[in-house]
Amino acid sequence: MILPLLLSASSLSVPFVSQHKDTCGAAALAMVLRYWSEDVTQEDVARALVRPELHGIAGSQLAEFARSRGLEAVAYRGDMAQLRDFVGKGRPLIVAWHLGGTRYHDVAVIGFDDERRAVLVNDPAAGPSRAVKAATFEKRWAGAGYWTLLVTRKGPP
């Protein structure tokens, strides 16, 4: 369940990018790269990485693209405590959701709303700063094996 847009949420200022067809990964990565002041569009990412047979982009390719831009990128099996820690340190993440059947979707995690028990995401399909109930977020994320991508600048924060 997606809750109404939050106007005063505790979240990172991650620029929002609305996705084109089958480009949620490209849009999510473009958001995070723009957060790190990289001049990149989802079209740049998609041109380099979209695989029509996957109806999108493989997660490993997102990490490779970020590294090709000089950033550090690590894909791993995450947990909620790690998400909170990284976001609390000013580092947005990309996670994959399983939406049912063979449908997967990438979103950028930008904050948390403890009062509403929600995770704040920039969802390239649904809009910026969306509050998703933590239980719904966790179920979708678990379905995708808790796949998480951390992209940061090299060196100390």
Where are these regions (language model features)?
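Sec/Tat-exported extracytoplasmic proteins
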Residues: A28, V32-S37, L49, E53, ...
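Residue-level signal for well-ordered alpha-helical segments
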Residues: A9-S10, D22, A26, D39, ...
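Noncatalytic regulatory segments and standalone regulatory/sensor domains
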Residues: I2, G88, P92, F112-P157
